[in-house]
Amino acid sequence: MKKFYIAANWKMNMNRAEAKQLATEMKAGLKDGKNKYMIAPSFTLLQDVASVLKGSNILLGAQNMGLEEKGAHTGEVSVLQLLDVGVQAVILGHSERRHIYKETDDLINKKVKLALKHGLEVILCVGELLEEREAGHAEAVCERQIKKGLAEVSAKDLDKVTIAYEPVWAIGTGKNASPEDADAIHSSIRKTLAALYGEKAAKNMIIQYGGSMKPENAAGLLKKHNIDGGLIGGAGLKTETFLPIALFSE
């Protein structure tokens, strides 16, 4: 049976007590789960959540990281600091980082290479704006973001890389691509990966869907051939909405 990768991006939500409570509930709910799981809390919550998840089947993720190991980078958190609190994976290139904080493909690529250098798993987010989709450029945008985001990343590091497709127009809007539309873009992404790394490597890579996945639409999306998991935002903030997605195939 196909193993899915379901990740919860908590974004800028919760205090320490709330985060520990939710992590505890998710740990209990997923303890017998057969899929791959990750939780990405805010930086200030990482240590508390790490203490809850220790020894569990849930990876501890970060939502971003700085582009250098240390030094004069006010407000940034380095890969070494993330490792120090037990982080195992990091989300890079999220649409909010690209479009609100103006992170470029080149900057994201530097972070990807730095994370992989230190052994972190990476979820590289790609996706188009509404105007790009309406102009028929969705596939080209994703292709560019993948090629630039993975520049100088070797095939041997691909087992630590996941691609998350985020149609930007569906993030936090309640809108979502149809399963057929999402699968078509995922197929295009896999073709791009095949051109870069070969058919076998592309077939083995995980491509998550990250556009307002929720219990009501998760099964329809995850049953599609090229959709291998979900990067979950709002539905990842409550066990009653996250667990049905995380356990849908069981």
UniProtKB/Swiss-Prot annotation:
Its EC number is 5.3.1.1. It is found in: Cytoplasm. Homodimer. It catalyses: D-glyceraldehyde 3-phosphate = dihydroxyacetone phosphate. PANTHER family: TRIOSEPHOSPHATE ISOMERASE (PTHR21139:SF42). Pfam families: TIM. The active site is at 94 (electrophile), 166 (proton acceptor). It comes from the Bacteria. Involved in the gluconeogenesis. Catalyzes stereospecifically the conversion of dihydroxyacetone phosphate (DHAP) to D-glyceraldehyde-3-phosphate (G3P). Keywords: Cytoplasm, Gluconeogenesis, Glycolysis, Isomerase. Gene3D superfamilies: Aldolase class I. It comes from Treponema denticola (strain ATCC 35405 / DSM 14222 / CIP 103919 / JCM 8153 / KCTC 15104). NCBIfam families: tim. Belongs to the triosephosphate isomerase family. Its main location: cytoplasm. Pathway: Carbohydrate biosynthesis; gluconeogenesis; Carbohydrate degradation; glycolysis; D-glyceraldehyde 3-phosphate from glycerone phosphate: step 1/1. One of its GO terms (biological process) is glyceraldehyde-3-phosphate biosynthetic process. This is Triosephosphate isomerase. InterPro entries: Aldolase_TIM, TIM_sf, TrioseP_Isoase_bac/euk, Triosephosphate_isomerase, Triosephosphate_isomerase_AS. One of its GO terms (molecular function) is triose-phosphate isomerase activity. Substrate binds at residues 9-11, 172, 212, 233-234. GO terms for cellular component: cytosol. It is an enzyme of class 5 (isomerase).
